[in-house]
Amino acid sequence: EKIASYTLKEVCHKADILMVCVKPKDMYDLCSEMKTHIGKELKIVSVAAGITLENLKDALSGGKVYRAMPNIGAKHNLGITSIFSHEELNEILDIFNYLGKAIVVEDEDKINLHTSLIGSAPAFYFEIINEFEHRLNELLPDNVSKRDITLLFLTSLISAIQNGENLEDLIESIKSKGGTTEAGLNHLYENDFINIFSEAIDAAKNRAAELSMD
């Protein structure tokens, strides 16, 4: 089966909506290549963290510009995407709602918070699961795989979502006074786990703000 390929000029001329999915460090070079090929009606959606709508408009010199911050769940149509623009949003919302759920951000400054919560947070979860896997692999039999451990987390989350239960209530339903779960949780609380996790979110948010000033 043949796969069509297009030059950047052809893409800009043929597309109604153009998704620009590059890292922030590569965005301005790409905009420089694109700007001479952009018509005023082309809708351009950037997923680069930290690059403001104003900076995108200046770099592109044309088109209707949107910012979107999806997360990894979009690969499975389970993503959450925050969107900001001064343009009409219906078509863009339709695309990202197909990939999960789209959230309109009214204040562009808040998209930095959405970046840290929506875009970066899955990596924080993965790191916790990864460390959990390493420790359990030291303690459990060889026939317990990483996949089994990941499924442990996944089934717990599915249960919470399907039953609409409060996470605090789920924690209470698992732990018992003086038991193993309470001992582990107390160790987390005593070692400032909550603040460390909160500070990680703040660090991601602050970095997104720094990128917007570059």
Tell me what each language-model feature is:
Residues P70-A74, T115-Y125:
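Glycine/serine-rich anion-binding loops at beta->alpha junctions
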Residues E1, S5-I83:
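Rossmann-like NAD(P)(H) cofactor-binding subdomain of soluble oxidoreductases
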